[in-house]
Amino acid sequence: MLATRLSRPLSRLPGKTLSACDRENGARRPLLLGSTSFIPIGRRTYASAAEPVGSKAVLVTGCDSGFGFSLAKHLHSKGFLVFAGCLMKDKGHDGVKELDSLNSDRLRTVQLNVCSSEEVEKVVEIVRSSLKDPEKGMWGLVNNAGISTFGEVEFTSLETYKQVAEVNLWGTVRMTKSFLPLIRRAKGRVVNISSMLGRMANPARSPYCITKFGVEAFSDCLRYEMYPLGVKVSVVEPGNFIAATSLYSPESIQAIAKKMWEELPEVVRKDYGKKYFDEKIAKMETYCSSGSTDTSPVIDAVTHALTATTPYTRYHPMDYYWWLRMQIMTHLPGAISDMIYIR
């Protein structure tokens, strides 16, 4: 009964995007319906002075498409020297070609697989050798590269869990550790792209949730350690932007589902049945097609984290529905929040 009362009002909330933020000291602000946290991001002015951009160097991972692609172009337009890490640069990906077509000495695409220590170290050397004064370091690192998958625990192979973690979690750790010496010299910024699913769990998304919860914890630990050294660490937690990031298409969802079903142990297929399996896939298709196609709230959040004198600890670019749902999941007792999923 309570789950129904909660879910129906949530579904009627307008689809406007928010950017509710915790301040740098990590203190929670009251989350009231009348607070400024409910101002849509398109109308909200971040209350913080801006650092001069100059020609500060920033590295963004995962720039082949999605957030990273848009970020690279936007930060370049703001005057940054941008190193755009692209997984598919060596394969001539269309996104890489478009970035290269800008023909700017302030935007350089680099081959970068965040799972490869060798490629990461090569990029460290490329960045260091490109800086006017390496001793002054590099201003910003945006850990954006990520992959996603879906499937209930019994439907998901252990190998899939490892693959998602290698990119989303260990890729973030690997990149951060490799670039921290340059970031520390500049007293710069680390911005980690997490997700609302790094704050609240979701059925059929455990591989992704695990990694994003890990990114949240890693970011908090790093922020505590770096604060005395003048480095500021922020986390951006986007809502549902799947439709804007090309993570899934109807075809890719069906291909993943087909492979998943075929590889399931016979006992799992027998116990759950194809009807149950297909219903879960249909829910995933609906979720993927219902998200926002406008990435600007995320781009604005990352830009603020890189340029503000006092950047926020966390940014929440998401619509009202997901913002309120996250507050319920993270602030109310588990016995209540569980009712959203357990009926």
Swiss-Prot record:
Modified residues annotated as N6-succinyllysine in this record: K259
Catalytic residues as annotated in Swiss-Prot or TrEMBL: Y208
Coiled coil: none
Activity control, per UniProt: Requires phosphatidylcholine as an allosteric activator for enzymatic activity.
Residues glycosylated per entry: S219
Residues bearing the modification N6-acetyllysine: K73, K97, K132, K177, K212, K258, K259, K280
Extent of the transit peptide: 1-46
GO cellular component: intracellular membrane-bounded organelle; matrix side of mitochondrial inner membrane; mitochondrial matrix; mitochondrion
Transmembrane as UniProt keyword: no
Location (main, coarse): mitochondrion
GO biological process: steroid metabolic process
Listed GO MF terms: 3-hydroxybutyrate dehydrogenase activity
Residues recorded as bearing Phosphoserine in the entry: S246
Pfam families recorded: adh_short (PF00106)
Ligand binding (NAD(+)): 59-83
EC number: 1.1.1.30
Catalytic activity: (R)-3-hydroxybutanoate + NAD(+) = acetoacetate + NADH + H(+)
Quaternary structure and interacting proteins, as annotated: Homotetramer.
Protein name: D-beta-hydroxybutyrate dehydrogenase, mitochondrial
Species annotation: Homo sapiens
Gene (UniProt): BDH1
